[in-house]
Amino acid sequence: MAKQDSFTSDEWTLLRLAPSLVAGATTAADPSGIFASIKEAAAGAGVVSNAFKTNTGLELFAALATDHSIPGMPDPKTLLGEGSREQQLEKFKNAVLERVKSATDLVARKASAGEADAYRKMLADVAEKAADASKEGGFLGFGGVRVSDKEQAFISEVKRAAGVT
């Protein structure tokens, strides 16, 4: 069972930020406006909150849930790099996938198997629920699809990076 002191400060920050980064990158996979972005971010936060509630018996989740400090965000230039908007969004998604892989590898090394499985599942669920939170490609709420092909592709990439089958 893993507690906060099982991790370095940077490792703990990574574990805490990874779900938010996944939600943001899911939104970036197929951007569709401010209201959709807000819905997708809120859906990701809801998944994290639910994971904390349903995994209270796991020390890692109990520690994550009780840490109310505000972690430092990565430098945007590190996540986005240079280039066109499309290039920056692609770099952002790739940077997030690298962090997902690092976070899940870290939990696999330092936490119990149950904690690692629950953490992996949480990250995959964040991507799925964020993508499902608003329609893509419609007009004023009419038409469109719930999860776009681009979002579905990113969900698959998150699952692969997290080791979720």
Please describe what each predicted stretch is.
Residues M1-T165:
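Small-residue-enriched hydrophobic alpha-helices in membranes
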